[in-house]
Design a protein with these regions (language model features):
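Short boundary/loop segments of OB/S1/cold-shock single-stranded nucleic-acid-binding domains
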Residues: 25-34
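C-terminal partner/receptor-binding element of secreted or periplasmic proteins
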Residues: 173-207
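Bacterial Sec-dependent N-terminal signal peptides
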Residues: 1-26
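Exposed beta-strand and adjacent loop surfaces of beta-rich binding modules
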Residues: 16, 29, 53-55
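Short, solvent-exposed mixed-charge patches
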Residues: 22, 208-210
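Aromatic-patch recognition
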Residues: 33-35, 40-174
């Protein structure tokens, strides 16, 4: 289970970068939910890890393309084909972006009310967040945001132990494991998933997007 979760986390963390590894346009079946509640069904064109957070390019069934700013959208999602080595076939994985207020703009002088990818949903939500850098080696920096009780907190390799221990304090058996083997930074999705399963109402299943 740990190996699977680690692989799943790695896929989601690298998705936004690897999907732009070449110049081919990446278009996927999906939908956009506008701020007025209207849902548009069609295709979503990927732009870049950071531009996907500040706007979304939607293509209607008639081929007309419209770019919506984050201020106009509450959420969007699309089906991303993930290769399953066990079946040697592709399985659609739902990628979901929702609007949240963050502390850092993804692009210079950009908005801080943006659309970010929700990787884990439940009592604690986990979001992947990308921001542009000035580094010649890495164009984008990846961090997380975690959310509990509608409070968004930025989380990185340096502060994850403090933040997660506080968020899972009502599950002491898990709290003491944070930062230990199998519960390090690369396992934050698994740790949050375990906590969400512990706190979920009986019979409910809250977890990673699939």
């Amino acid at each position: 289970m740990k190996n699977f979760t680690t692989l799943f986390t790695a896929i989601l963390m690298t998705f936004a970068v690897t999907v732009f590894a070449n110049d081919d346009t990446k278009v996927y079946e999906g939908s956009v939910v506008l701020e007025n509640g209207e849902t548009l069904v069609g295709q979503i064109e990927m732009l870049s890890p950071t531009l996907n957070e500040v706007k979304v390019k939607f293509i209607a069934s008639n081929g007309k393309a419209t770019t919506y700013k984050a201020s106009e959208v509450s959420a969007y999602s699309f089906a991303f084909p993930k290769y399953d080595a066990s079946t040697k076939s592709y399985i659609d994985q739902t990628i979901e972006y929702v609007k949240k207020d963050v502390t850092v703009a993804p692009i210079p002088f950009g908005p801080k009310s943006v659309l970010i990818e929700r990787q884990v949903a439940g009592t604690v939500n986990l979001y992947n967040f990308y921001a542009e850098t000035r580094s010649a080696e890495h164009a984008f920096e990846h961090n997380y945001f975690v959310e509990k009780d509608n409070q968004m907190v930025e989380m990185n390799r340096e502060n994850f132990k403090t933040i997660l221990k506080d968020m899972v304090a009502d599950y002491p058996e898990l709290q003491v494991k944070v930062g230990t083997k199998g519960y390090g930074y690369k396992y934050v999705a698994q740790t949050i998933q375990e906590y969400n399963q512990y706190t979920a109402p009986k019979g409910a299943f809250l977890g990673m997007n699939d």
